[in-house]
Curated annotation (Swiss-Prot):
Taxonomic lineage: Bacteria, Pseudomonadati, Pseudomonadota, Alphaproteobacteria, Hyphomicrobiales
GO annotation, cellular component aspect: ribonucleoprotein complex; ribosome
Gene Ontology molecular function, alphabetical: large ribosomal subunit rRNA binding
Listed NCBIfam families: PRK00099.1-1
HAMAP family (alphabetical): Ribosomal_uL10
Lineage: superkingdom: Bacteria
Organism for this UniProt entry: Chelativorans sp. (strain BNC1)
Name recorded for this polypeptide: Large ribosomal subunit protein uL10
Keyword field: Ribonucleoprotein, Ribosomal protein, RNA-binding, rRNA-binding
Known partners and oligomeric status: Part of the ribosomal stalk of the 50S ribosomal subunit. The N-terminus interacts with L11 and the large rRNA to form the base of the stalk. The C-terminus forms an elongated spine to which L12 dimers bind in a sequential fashion forming a multimeric L10(L12)X complex.
């Protein structure tokens, strides 16, 4: 990689560290190309991305970003998984690591908070933004449904009383 290319790569990586919801750092020694492509496609489907960068360039890109505290994680063959959704990258990386011993999560960051491997796994267990939005919409709709039932209940009760009188008159 030439010097100009390195500058561009560091600048793009710096933007990643500044603008993403979460970053996961993991070692990938022993992953086959097919496994790496599988990880990349799963991450892409979840709205994230995976990059492999030289540790020295990643450390330079981290300078001046909220995620600066994770520089110590960049040792050996490391990859960076990131997404705008704070839960997506940790979730996909953790699920992939469960099925593949060659991917070892070292840690990560969510904003200015540095996370160890257990912190990343804990973050992965949280519901995603879409799941949280669905729960909130459900909680908002539930009271409206109950109000509609309460408003319609007196009319239904009145109809049952009238129906009972009608059956009583028919029986007599």
């Amino acid at each position: 990689m030439e010097r100009a290319e390195k500058r561009e790569f560091v600048a793009s990586l710096n933007q990643v560290f500044q603008n993403t919801g979460s970053v996961v750092v993991a070692t990938y020694a022993g992953l086959t190309v097919a496994q790496m492509n599988d990880l990349r496609s799963k991450m892409r489907a979840a709205g994230g991305s995976v990059k492999v960068a030289k540790n020295r360039l990643a450390k330079i890109a981290l300078q001046g970003t909220p995620s600066e505290g994770i520089q110590a994680l960049f040792q050996g063959q490391t990859l960076i998984a990131y997404s705008d959704d704070p839960v997506a990258a940790p979730k996909i990386a953790s699920e992939f690591a469960k099925g593949n011993d060659n991917l070892v999560i070292l840690g990560g960051a969510m904003g200015a908070t540095a996370l160890d491997a257990e912190g990343v796994k804990a973050l992965a267990s949280l519901p995603s933004l879409d799941e949280l939005r669905a729960k909130i919409v459900g909680m908002i709709q539930t009271p409206a449904t109950r109000i509609a039932q309460i408003v319609n209940a007196p009319a239904g009760q009145l109809a049952r009383v009238v129906g009972a009188y009608a059956r009583k008159d028919e029986a007599a």
